[in-house]
Amino acid sequence: MGKLVALTVLGASLALLGERLLNFRERVSTSREIKPTEPQNCHLIEGLENGSEDIDILPSGLAFISTGLKYPGMPSFAPDKPGRIFLMDLNEPYPKAQALEISDGFDQDSLNPHGISTFIDKDNTVYLYAVNHPHMDSTVEIFKFEEQPRSLVHLKTIKHELFESVNDIVVLGPEQFYATRDHYFTSHFLVLLEMILDPHWTSVLFYSPKEVKVVAQGFSSANGITVSLDQKYVYVADVTAKNIHIMKKHNNWDLTPVKVIQLGTLVDNLTVDPATGDILAGCHPNPMKLLIYNPEDPPGSEVLRIQDPLSDNPRVSTLYSNNGSVLQGSTVASVYHKKMLIGTIFHKALYCEL
């Protein structure tokens, strides 16, 4: 009887694993054909060669870019170089990327920046918040931006026991922000198992000096996060579920679900067009090529625009798509006055005029 029970349990476990493997294969399918779509006047940005995972543009047109991310399972073209924060002034006729110096006292060799977000205080001081993975840990670094000379002053490192596998961040007040956890586990083996079994254990966190709490959960892999222009709604990308969750923000910072927009492609970082309120999504049309990188058959890039996301019928259109011949592994797109920057996990960055 004991052997029969053991065999039954083993058989059920293998059947479940087989079903989950098929589901995983479907979620990271490489079967999609990419129809090239490119605005006029696009060119690669000189100096950004090792990723540009996230981009945040100030109302003034200054764009902050996080580069050099080393992420488990992803390629890296400069594994021994620390990450950097770059700046571009999109008001210039020919914007160039400038690496920002960081004040003494911060271990720049440990900088491994992921998602970033800016906050402008009442006195117009600009603060940059960056998810950092020093030694594959997760922290949030707070910097003050200095206009003259353009540089960053490190103010604070935020750590918390809930800050595991943090991906992206959106800041809504002084030391008040939402952050996403893209995995529940942190060890490579358990992360792989989590990706296959897909238990939907990832979440959105809220942080303030007074409290840290989980405000939304049940995502396959919570990734990019941003807010509507009126800051009443929070947009969360569930990357492996291929959708965007729209959530209502309450006075106590809790989030409640409103709707889900299905996109049929893996959704990474999100930004909002300041002129229209449209969502821009950096996407991965063939993610298996990210996991198994072949420079002869690289992963493609895709940027989607979601118009009227709060309406009953949001309109989804493609702003940019490429099979990897120009841009590989797009993660983010951000716009300012008809100028668009597209970033990637480990590859280059693109400047386009819309």
Curated annotation (Swiss-Prot):
InterPro entries: 6-blade_b-propeller_TolB-like (IPR011042), Arylesterase (IPR002640), Paraoxonase2 (IPR008364), Serum_paraoxonase/arylesterase (IPR051288). Ca(2+) 2 binds at residues 54, 116, 168. Keywords: Calcium, Disulfide bond, Glycoprotein, Hydrolase, Metal-binding, Phosphoprotein, Secreted, Signal. Its main location: secreted. The modification Phosphoserine is found at residue 165. Disulfide bonds join 42-352. Has low activity towards the organophosphate paraxon and aromatic carboxylic acid esters. Rapidly hydrolyzes lactones such as statin prodrugs (e.g. lovastatin). Hydrolyzes aromatic lactones and 5- or 6-member ring lactones with aliphatic substituents but not simple lactones or those with polar substituents. This is Serum paraoxonase/lactonase 3. It comes from Rattus norvegicus (Rat). The gene is Pon3.
